[in-house]
Amino acid sequence: MNIIVVGLSHKTAPVEVRERVAFSPNLIERPLRELVSLDDISEGVIVSTCNRVEIYATTHDIAGGTARIKRFLADHHRIPLESLEQYLYSYHSEAAIRHVFRVASSLDSMVVGEPQILGQIKTAYGYAAEYRTSGTILNRFLHKAFSVAKRVRTETRIASSAVSVAFAAVELARKILGDLSGKTVMLIGAGEMCELAAKHFLTSGARGLLVANRTFAKGERLAAEFGGEAIPFEELFQELHRADIVLSSTGAPHTIIAPRDVEAVVKRRKFKPMFFIDIAVPRDIDPRVNDLESAYLFTVDDLQEIVEANMAQRNQEASKGEEIVEQEIGQFHCWLSSLESTPTIVALRARFEEIRRAELEKTLCGWKDLSPEAEKRLEIMTLSIMNKLLHTPTAVLKRAGQGGRTDLYTDALRQLFDLQTSRQDDDELELELEEE
Amino acid sequence: MSKFFFYCTLVLYGGATLAYLIYLLRTTPLLATWAHRLISAGFIAHLLSTIHRAVLTGQLPLTSMHESLSFFSLAIVGAFIFFERSYRVAILGSFVTPLALLAIIASSALPDEIRHISPILRSNWFWGHALMAFISYAAFTITFATSAMYLLQEHFLKRKRFGALFRKLPSLEIMDDISYRCLTIGFPLLTLAIISGAIWSVQAGGNYWNWADRKQVWSMITWFIYAALLHGRLTTGWRGRRAALLSILGFIVLLITFFGMRHSVTW
């Protein structure tokens, strides 16, 4: 059995194509069922996010399976396959395993290390499990992908730094003020960006929020939303000393906070550090405020610079993540190959058992004066002969599976004993694995 | 035996310092872990070496420059391990361990014969004086290191340099906090060391205070600087940059006192 991946992502397709191919999560049942009803596709999972649409499936026929899934994608979304094909990529076997591990670990994301993708794959898998379109192989495969993602997250610092401006502001404030719990944030003006940053500060532990807006009512509304306190704009400088973090974004045509204002405030605060972010254009805060003792002023450009530096660091950490993925691929591949041999073992055993039963019945039928004791002994003897005969081939096959050389043995056995592995065997196998 | 442990210490401190210095340039969490293990192992070896020597001579190993420097180094590393544990600031090691290594290298270069100070000078006041002085020196060494780190980090923040070192250095508040805590440990000890030194000086047949003894005079200057710093912190809220600069000045004067001025009595 092989794992195949067919899909497209932000790397291969523009957004107009991605949105046409996307699957809606509440209507996912039908496409999932259609997918597993395709010829020789036994299991399927559909992952659909704004940056990627991918189908994970299992098949015996790699080329045919891949072609059928591509056709399915085109037909389902009513796009001619010829125009869709250029955006699609497909992987099978080891490359497919690598791809999914990388995607789950957020190594293939637009913003490397972003945490959403793992949740999105988990949700997609949840649907497949609910509608029973994923089976033994994809179940195990995706659980493995989740654990690889977890390893990458904990063993590298891929997600340790902020990659949005609002988060960068929080990170920067921590470098100055240390622990943010108990710190007070002041909003001057009520821009959207400020609001977002304030939200981040409050979820990061900051306690109080002061809002100074020219329109007092608007300031009051915003303050109420976050459980803060509105202050009249004219009293800004009387209240400024209460703020540890100041976010300013008024539409004022000139600066509203001058160095001497801040100097007085800093003295009043006994030089407790103050963190200023000026989001307004033109600026609200005189740049010379940054030269004052215990006052640290940053603009959006500064924050953007941090974001870029953090991105560079993430990309560096990503190479450590790639190493972890490579280690894990080998292990999973071994398991997948050993799976190949299991249905053969089951079929072989069934064939032997069938022969033993038939012969035993034939013998017992013509043997009238046999005591129940002797009958039991015969049963045990034949069973143990069968087990002894099967012991070595089973062990050899399992070993071969771990070394990835199963095809040779399973093919030979199938031919020699005329075995047919069926769907039923897979079910038995599943039971066996669940017991594990 | 104490020599064997002493050389073990030298090697372990050397390894730890190297690891901490590489950690400045390369961000590998594993490196910090190993540096910490090395310095901890070094500290244990150093402690054993010091205890062995004390048992051997029947006196605190603070009688010669060799012994004093070694003890100074031991106290620095002890203080570092304590603060590293409580604040989890690995990068502190990159600033502190080189100082401890320098002290122990200097110590190893000096004659290590066992000296017995004359019975007149043997007094609990002397031992108390020396012990407290060195522990306060160690505390001030940590203050010096965190002050230097503070100034560096502040420079990055004011000039908007967001490099790898900026990322590794802790927040200004944490460094200021460590500085302050060390000051509150170091200053009372230094005060007690000066007082017990004066009492001991009387016992040894001198005066409480001898203005001709340059070491005493410089100790007083050191004391005044740290007193001013503590006073400024407690009353007008001196902190951050101002406090860091004064701490560095205090440490420089302290080094002059320790190395530059010979004691009129013992050395």
Curated annotation (Swiss-Prot), chain A:
Pathway: Porphyrin-containing compound metabolism; protoporphyrin-IX biosynthesis; 5-aminolevulinate from L-glutamyl-tRNA(Glu): step 1/2. It holds the Pfam family Shikimate_DH. It catalyses: (S)-4-amino-5-oxopentanoate + tRNA(Glu) + NADP(+) = L-glutamyl-tRNA(Glu) + NADPH + H(+). Gene3D superfamilies: Glutamyl-tRNA reductase, N-terminal domain, NAD(P)-binding Rossmann-like Domain. Keywords: NADP, Oxidoreductase, Porphyrin biosynthesis. CDD domains: NAD_bind_Glutamyl_tRNA_reduct. Substrate binds at residues 49-52, 109, 114-116, 120. The active site is at 50 (nucleophile). Signal peptide: none annotated. Catalyzes the NADPH-dependent reduction of glutamyl-tRNA(Glu) to glutamate 1-semialdehyde (GSA). Homodimer. Possesses an unusual extended V-shaped dimeric structure with each monomer consisting of three distinct domains arranged along a curved 'spinal' alpha-helix. The N-terminal catalytic domain specifically recognizes the glutamate moiety of the substrate. The second domain is the NADPH-binding domain, and the third C-terminal domain is responsible for dimerization. This is Glutamyl-tRNA reductase. It comes from Pelobacter propionicus (strain DSM 2379 / NBRC 103807 / OttBd1). The gene is hemA.
